[in-house]
Regions:
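Short, flexible, surface-exposed loop segments at domain boundaries
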Residues: 1-201
Length: 201
């Protein structure tokens, strides 16, 4: 989480996560439910498809910035549209070393409570508006500014259950490193009390 080890309790509900997992062992010896291999293709009520995968033994669970840092990728901000301190961002996830013409542009929403990080400081949408970086209302091109994004899911009563929101923007490497350091200390603190397995730090 944020590029550092984490417990599940460190990760807010709704955080968009990437997972690497595998099928359980022999159903006769598995201690967890064994689902049909194609269960992820079945729709379950309002949840849609993909909510009950058969691969329920997890090797790696990571949030968006951790995934991008591990794979050497960044989000390139293409456009922002604002109205009343909330709006949408258009962005592309690309290799940090260079663009990828095959990557599709994503449109994600954000609210006034979005956390924007610059160095060791948290700033707001209003700060970006006052500095002339973002418009007060309307659209503005962002010319592929490279950032890291925290992505989350929120209830949407317009029936867009798969629509994503941006929870955090780290504007530079210093901001991301600071977030990683903070999460590292959050993870270490309980270990100092209860102890952790060797190598888990």
């Amino acid at each position: 989480y944020h590029g550092a080890p984490a417990d599940l309790r460190d990760i807010p509900l709704g955080t968009f996560l990437h997972v690497r997992s595998f099928l359980p062992p022999d159903p006769k010896t598995s201690v967890v439910p064994v689902l049909p291999v194609n269960s992820k293709d079945e729709a379950h009520g309002y949840s849609g498809k993909g909510t009950r995968p058969a691969e329920n033994h997890v090797l790696l669970l990571e949030d968006e910035p951790s995934h991008c840092l591990r794979e050497g990728k960044v989000w390139k901000l293409m456009e922002v549209e604002l109205k009343n301190n909330e709006g949408t961002i258009k962005a592309r996830r690309e290799p940090a070393a260079g663009g990828d013409a095959t990557v599709e542009e994503e449109t994600m929403s954000f609210d006034a409570d979005i956390r924007i990080w610059h160095g060791r400081e948290r700033i707001t949408v209003k700060d970006l508006i006052n500095e002339g970086i973002w418009p007060k209302n309307g659209k503005q091109t962002l010319d592929g500014q490279a950032v890291q994004l925290g992505i989350t899911w929120k209830p949407n009563y317009g029936n867009e259950y798969d629509h994503l929101y941006v929870s955090d923007i780290w504007l530079d490497d210093a901001a991301m490193l600071h977030a990683t350091d903070l999460q590292t200390e959050t993870h270490r603190a309980p270990c100092a009390v209860v102890g952790c397995p060797p190598g888990s730090m």
